[in-house]
Design a protein with these regions (language model features):
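Helix-loop junction within the histidine kinase core
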Residues: 39-50
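Short conserved segment of the HATPase_c
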Residues: 136-148
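Short helix-loop "hinge" at the ATP-lid/N-box region of the Bergerat-fold HATPase_c
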Residues: 105-106
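Short alpha-helical Gxxx[C/S/T] motif in the catalytic ATP-binding
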Residues: 161, 165
């Protein structure tokens, strides 16, 4: 049946249609997962599982997971301390936060670089995702963390990702914000405690 229906299209057209179908299916799946996450977070049923996380391994794995989304010619980089850092946190939730920030950076960066970095600052560890994309107006620094808030309508998405990131970061005892002083694109910062309260 599907073969018959596709007979009227050329190979190129079929490939393009399948590409659109794949993209829209992924968007729908993302929306469903985001709504489920929000529902759990709001109901207080979102549990975390703390463990000792080796940050170089987690960050390298996170970058590998988004590498296919990076525009041609854009550099994807990791900046980290020389010494290995082990953080007691929820690895899955931290990776979810960083992945979301990196995916957003990929959407809005067509040239230059996207950098994931982390460092210790006092009793906190500071992660950042910095890009050389179109940037974000500082007036939208808080607005973008609200649900269904999008920077534009040109890129796919539903405006739930950053809201979920903020809820997850709070759950991990930290905070997330847009660095409004950075003017070379966009820079998001996630601060987590080195030793989270039990």
């Amino acid at each position: 049946m599907l073969n018959d229906a596709g007979a009227e299209f050329s190979e190129e057209e079929r490939s393009e249609l399948l590409g659109h179908l794949h993209t829209n299916t992924n968007l729908l799946l993302t929306l469903v997962n985001d709504v489920l996450d929000l529902s759990k977070l709001e109901s207080g049923n979102y549990s975390i599982s703390l463990s000792n996380v080796v940050l170089p391994e987690l960050c390298q794995s996170t970058l590998a997971g988004v590498a296919h989304r990076v525009a041609e010619g854009v550099r994807l980089e990791l900046k980290q301390p020389d010494t290995e850092i082990i953080l007691n946190t929820d690895a899955q939730r931290l990776q979810q936060i960083l992945t979301n920030l990196l995916v957003n950076a990929c959407k809005y960066t067509s040239q230059g670089s996207i950098v994931l970095a982390y460092e210790i600052a006092g009793t906190s560890i500071i992660f950042s995702v910095t890009d050389t994309g179109c940037g974000i107006d500082k007036e939208k620094g808080e607005l973008i963390f609200q649900r269904f808030e999008k920077l534009d309508n040109m890129n796919p998405g539903f405006g739930l990702g950053l809201s979920i990131c903020r809820s997850l970061t709070t759950l991990l005892g930290g905070k997330i914000y847009l660095d409004t002083q950075y003017t070379g694109g966009a820079r998001f910062v996630v601060e987590l405690p080195l030793h989270p309260p039990v």
